[in-house]
């Protein structure tokens, strides 16, 4: 069965129903997601290279990890699930630092994929051992790239088309 997602009103309040993610994106229904930024002991940031098979934003660098919050779930639980699925990383709720909420509106693929989301942003850290054991989820993530804040800012300034655009996230990173 397709993942069910709680629907929101445009103001972020619960709409009182859930539906499958295909309908969510076909109709542009507002919903909740999570973004998780992973840092290593050297202060570098993990970016994922989205799979070339992805329907939206294939082959672009993106947040370390992200995903939908399933119906009835919490942001922290979704973040823990996505870290495990996309990176092979096991973390506990105490390992996640909540940063902020933001909204994202985007129309892709000639209007067939509409993404209207409220997202919770988290930060976590990994040891060198954890970083060495990261495993990209087939079909979701093709590779990883570690960058310092300075490297990211330089690369993003020169080649913004290589990144999924997340202005609030990138503004936060620039302030580190």
Task: Report residues per predicted region.
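Short helix/strand-bridging catalytic loops that position acidic/His residues to coordinate divalent metals
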Residues: 21-24, 62-67
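Nudix hydrolase/Nudix homology domain
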Residues: 22, 59, 71, 100-105, ...
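The catalytic Nudix box helix
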Residues: 47, 64-99
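A structural signal for short, well-ordered beta-strand segments
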Residues: 36, 65, 98, 120-122
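Acidic, metal-coordinating catalytic segment for phosphate/diphosphate chemistry
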Residues: 1-35, 39-42
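A glycine-rich, hydrophobic loop/mini-helix early in the fold
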Residues: 33-65
């Amino acid at each position: 069965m397709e993942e069910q997602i709680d629907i929101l009103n445009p103001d972020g309040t619960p709409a009182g129903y859930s539906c499958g993610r295909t309908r969510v994106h076909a109709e542009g229904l507002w919903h909740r997601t999570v973004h998780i930024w992973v840092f290593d002991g050297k202060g570098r940031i993990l970016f994922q290279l989205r799979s070339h098979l992805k329907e939206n934003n294939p082959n672009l660098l993106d947040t370390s990890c992200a995903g939908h919050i399933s119906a009835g779930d919490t942001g922290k639980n979704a973040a823990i699930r996505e870290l495990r699925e996309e990176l092979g990383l096991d973390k506990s709720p105490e390992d996640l630092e909540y940063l902020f909420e933001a909204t994202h509106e985007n129309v892709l693929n000639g209007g067939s994929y509409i993404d209207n989301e409220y997202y919770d942003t988290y930060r976590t850290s990994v040891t060198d051992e954890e970083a060495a054991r990261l495993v990209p989820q087939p079909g979701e993530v093709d590779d990883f790239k570690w960058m310092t804040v300075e490297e990211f800012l330089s690369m993003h300034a020169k080649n913004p088309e290589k990144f999924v655009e997340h202005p609030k996230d990138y503004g936060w990173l620039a302030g580190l």
